[in-house]
Design a protein with these regions (language model features):
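Hydrophobic transmembrane alpha-helices
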Residues: 2-74
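Hydrophobic cores of alpha-helical transmembrane segments in multi-pass inner/ER membrane proteins
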Residues: 16-23, 115-125, 181-193
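Membrane-helix interface "capping/anchor" motifs
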Residues: 33-36, 76-87, 129-136
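Hydrophobic alpha-helical transmembrane segments
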Residues: 41-46, 85-89, 112, 135-143, ...
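Interfacial aromatic-anchored transmembrane helix boundaries in multi-pass membrane proteins
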Residues: 56-65, 90-120
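Juxtamembrane/transmembrane-helix interface segments of polytopic membrane transporters
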Residues: 149, 153-161, 191, 195
Length: 209
């Protein structure tokens, strides 16, 4: 889902960068008001490292294209949506520098899709279903976060004029539907394990709006 440099017109890329900076500034402000700020920062650093490491792991898929887990929905469920945006921003810089994924001019657009849209979609779908069932809320938050990010990327690419709606829907949507299911199931196991092993990590203060 990482968009490379040169795909999006610079004036559009600048808008996505500005939006990213606004949300990151909001994150820093909210973080300064959060209880257990030190614990939040430590856990954010740990999950940022995990997210970066996970991006280098390829999982075979029936589509012939390997899956790279996002991990951002996991970060959001544990630390809140603004933390998800911050982790996405840090990881995308590291992924570009060390793995050649994404780009610099396209970084803002990537953060908008996989950081902002994915984080807030995950958070609110997770919260909306939390009263029904814990596993359902984890799965639905993860799955819908990935699907909404996919839709956001389709919109960004349509605005950039690089592909038709038919092509984007036929290539991106089926693949990320599959990714959403896989990562949703994985997150159920991870969070259930963390709740038993380190419940304080699951119950830590969230950085959100």
């Amino acid at each position: 889902m990482h968009l490379p440099d040169g795909l999006i017109p610079l004036w559009q890329a600048a808008i996505y960068w500005i939006l990213t900076m606004i949300i990151l500034a909001l994150y820093l402000y909210k973080l300064s008001k959060t209880e257990d700020k030190q614990k939040v920062l430590i856990n954010t650093a740990i999950l940022a490292a995990v997210t970066f490491a996970a991006s280098s792991i390829s999982i075979p898929s029936p589509f012939g294209v390997p899956i790279h887990l996002f991990i951002i929905p996991l970060v959001v469920i544990l630390l809140g949506p603004l933390s998800g945006v911050a982790v996405a921003f840090l990881c995308f810089i590291a992924q570009f520098l060390f793995l050649g994924m994404g780009g610099i001019t396209s970084l803002g657009a990537n953060v908008v899709t996989m950081g902002i849209v994915m984080s807030f979609s995950t958070y609110y779908f997770y919260r909306f279903t939390a009263e029904l069932d814990d596993r359902l809320s984890i799965f639905s938050g993860t799955f819908m976060g990935i699907i909404m990010a996919t839709i956001a990327q389709v919109v960004i690419l349509l605005i950039a004029g690089v592909a038709t709606l038919e092509v984007l829907l036929s290539t991106l949507v089926p693949f990320y539907l599959f990714v959403g299911v896989v990562e949703g199931i994985i997150n159920i196991f991870i969070i259930s394990f963390l709740f038993k092993l380190k419940p304080e990590m699951v119950e830590i203060a969230k950085v959100g709006l």
